[in-house]
Amino acid sequence: MATEKPKKRSPRAWDTLNPPLSEWIRDAVATMGFDQMTPVQAATLPHFMGNKDVVVEAVTGSGKTLAFLIPLVQKLLRLSEPTKKHHVAAIIVSPTRELAAQIHTVLMKLLQFHEASAEILPHLKDDDEKRPFTTVPAIVPQLLVGGTTTTVQDLRFFLRHSPNVLISSPGRLVELMSSPHVHCPQSSFEVLVLDEADRLLDLGFKPDLQKILSHLPKQRRTGLFSASVSEAVGEIIRVGLRNPVKIEVKVKIKGGGILEDRKTPASLQMTYMVKPASQKLPALAELLRQLPVRPQRSIVFLSTCAAVDYFQHILPLILPEGFALVPLHGKHAAKVREKNFNKFLSSVSPTILLTTDLAARGLDIPQVDLVVQIDAPSDPKVFIHRSGRAGRAGRKGLAVVMLHPGREEDYVQFLEIRKTPIAPLEKPTITTSEDDAAEFAKKTRDFVLTDRGLFDKAQKAFVSWARSYGAHQATSIFRAADLDWADLGNAWGLLRMPRMPELKGWTGDKMCGLEIDWDNYAYKEKTREQQRKVALEEEKSGVKKQDKSEEFKRKRKNNEAWSAKHEKEDDRVERREKRRKRRDAEATSKMTDDEKVKQMELNDLIAEVRRQNREKAAAEAAAAKQEKDGEFKGFDD
């Protein structure tokens, strides 16, 4: 009787790791749906757990988060004793607050399976209750992001609960680490993780990153994780990794008998369609209607925040019935961003996230079926990150980028050279026409005419889009001189073209072929409409000119008395400062020793934050002064 051969164990099985994973970690990852390691986890964990620095480049949606959380957690929990009070053992730096929050969420889920850590976690939600003391190593995380808490609240949390793992965006981390009560000595600090490393090393984050590194010991484990690391190699060397292991996990597909490297998941279909600007949104609507399976989660990328603000009102005019639309961009208030992002994640009906490149990198958005880029991104590196929102973790996905006819079609070859091949979208067949474009333009303009506020949004959005287009890095492909401005006016439903440098030499119809009674074109918002009417009446009666003359005389008079007023103000400030110091002294005399220490800590942090704010304001003022010559001067009412 033939005996059955034992099943061959997968090289990506969790029990193949050496050193082996703790049993509770294996239980945790199993509940998260990871029956075995993803390729990036299988390649990274042995090295990072084996006390080596790593530089990891892997396709988006490949499980990078657990690839650094598991080694970090395992290393800290295998220490001989708990982390000392107010000492930090590990730091994870993320470029955005959303990504930092998601990493924190994954870590919290992981720690629910570790008994000592799980007992502490509920106490972290109560600011008035200190966490229980533990004699065995445990993970105590703290999330540091702007917009949800103040720096004073962050320091208070740190002093009360003594977290040993910080997950933060760069700016907020610098503020906390500037406190003399936050310690990262070589005896305690173990691991630094830079997630989305190439973005962290961009010019905008470089100063903050240097300050963070200056607080950390050189004897540490460092991991850099990103979807594209090669273009930031020079910066990575400066970070100070010690003989790092470079790990590159790419997907290889068979095409015509030839293995071809790709930077996106094989389950993702990468396509493009060539459409005039006026047909792009009708094409999007037809794509949503024609797909054989209705996408439950879709992401539509626009170039600017102002474009999102405008098209969130316009897209519902043309979307198929049953689709909800959620806007998200970086200029939303933190609470609005969080609310809209959670709304998109929790939606049970077909939903479209209308967004900018804020959602292109790092955000863990599961089960995205469709990604549409209305315009190609100005930075070619962002293209794969936008497209990679779909097709994550083996799920099938479709990504479509829309290109204008002509020179923009060279973008296809440009991407192929960068090992990101895209093919024409063949199924479903999208057959939009000039009639469809004209119908959409009329529908949009009719809608915009109902509220002058929409006209203002359209003008602002179009100007910002034109500037963004002119900032394309692939300047030989995306040239403002090649744009069909009249067609773009129809695409945006403009009532007239705005005044802007890009249209200086354009001789087309700046009124878009429309005759509009601008005097009676009203705002829906009553306050704004009242202000408009008052301004209109003043302009007609000539009061405005008189007002300007009177204002000039008044300012001149005020300037003459400025010195005297300034001296009086200095005296008032000095008196207020004396009163404040007297009150502070009285309050301090009534404090206990512990309260005095805490107050000193808060005062130190507040002083440091104020100093940094002054430096930041001065830098921004200098930058604004340099850019003043190219500033947009506005448009006609």
From Swiss-Prot:
It catalyses: ATP + H2O = ADP + phosphate + H(+). SUPFAM superfamilies: P-loop containing nucleoside triphosphate hydrolases (SSF52540). One of its GO terms (biological process) is rRNA processing. Residues 45-247 form the Helicase ATP-binding domain. Gene3D superfamilies: P-loop containing nucleotide triphosphate hydrolases. Keywords: ATP-binding, Coiled coil, Helicase, Hydrolase, Nucleotide-binding, Nucleus, Ribosome biogenesis, RNA-binding, rRNA processing. Residues 283-438 form the Helicase C-terminal domain. Its main location: nucleus. The keyword Nucleus applies. Residues 524-631 form a coiled coil. Residues 535-637 are annotated as: Disordered. Residues 535-553, 563-576, 583-618, 625-637 have a biased composition (Basic and acidic residues). ATP binds at A58, V59, T60, G61, S62, G63, K64, T65. Pfam families: CTE_SPB4, CTT_SPB4, DEAD, Helicase_C. A motif (DEAD box) lies at residues 195-198. InterPro entries: CTT_SPB4, DEAD/DEAH_box_helicase_dom, Helicase_ATP-bd, Helicase_C-like, P-loop_NTPase, RNA-helicase_DEAD-box_CS, RNA_helicase_DEAD_Q_motif, SPB4-like_CTE. Its EC number is 3.6.4.13. It is found in: Nucleus, Nucleolus. Component of pre-60S ribosomal complexes. Belongs to the DEAD box helicase family. DDX55/SPB4 subfamily. The Q motif is unique to and characteristic of the DEAD box family of RNA helicases and controls ATP binding and hydrolysis. ATP-binding RNA helicase involved in the biogenesis of 60S ribosomal subunits. Binds 90S pre-ribosomal particles and dissociates from pre-60S ribosomal particles after processing of 27SB pre-rRNA. Required for the normal formation of 18S rRNA through the processing of pre-rRNAs at sites A0, A1 and A2, and the normal formation of 25S and 5.8S rRNAs through the processing of pre-rRNAs at sites C1 and C2. This is ATP-dependent rRNA helicase SPB4. It comes from Gibberella zeae (strain ATCC MYA-4620 / CBS 123657 / FGSC 9075 / NRRL 31084 / PH-1) (Wheat head blight fungus).
